[in-house]
Amino acid sequence: MKLSRFSGIILSLFVILAFSSLVFAGSAGDEALQKLLDGNKRYVEGKFASKDLGDSRRTEILKGGQHPFATIISCSDSRVPPEHIFDQGLGDIFIVRVAGNVVDPIALGSIEYGVEHVHTPLLMILGHSDCGAVKATMETKGEPEGNIGAIVKKIQPAVKKAKKKGGSKDEILETAIKENVMNVYADVMKSPVVKELVHEGKLKIVVAEYNLSNGKVEMLELPKVKHEMKKSEHKTEKKSEKKAEKKTEKAH
């Protein structure tokens, strides 16, 4: 009985430590997001923070390695430079830029590197207003070809969904931009690496849209993606745990 109680205490301590690590990881992601939003506020107001972009900073991140606090997947559009719109400096954010902010295995590999190997607690999927890639997809007739066609194919589902919802041309464009961001989120969540980090509470994912007109970044509501453990799997795991506990009690 004494050993059984001791095992129970150890298990309780383990649960507390695990929960504490999840809370810490969650707060790290929240803090990283707040840093981005604070930076965007400075950008919009034109009150930029002083940044060391000289020799000392370059030497620091060369010798000490990179330690960015966020990974961002954004569009290649020259009007959407994440470092500027979030008022960040050298080594602050790990960025993956692709036209239309879509992802393929190569882009996903870069994202995985940022969240798993560079250990950023935050991943932001950033779309933007008046996106040329989405516009081009809306105007495409027939089967898209070539390398640009590969981008168009990734965006087409969002455009089709937006057209079904209806509205003016501008409204359809804006809806398609948001739908595309959500589709990218779903694609990112197919990554086993990303899924595991989210499940373990080590990674926070957010989706957002940058407004080219006013410079503001608007946070969007995440869609529900089934990345959690299936209920049947969860029940099986619970049963296995209970059996293991009973065997331990009998042994003692």
What does each model-found stretch correspond to?
Residues 74-79, 99-102, 128-129:
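Short glycine-enriched loops at secondary-structure junctions
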Residues 25-65, 90-91, 101-119, 132-252:
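Divalent-metal-activated hydrolytic enzyme cores
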Residues 125:
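Conserved functional hotspot residues or short segments at active or partner-binding sites
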Residues 1-11:
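Bacterial N-terminal signal peptides that target proteins for export
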Residues 79-96:
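Catalytic core of membrane glycerolipid acyltransferases/transacylases, capturing the structured
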Residues 9-21:
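Bacterial N-terminal signal peptides
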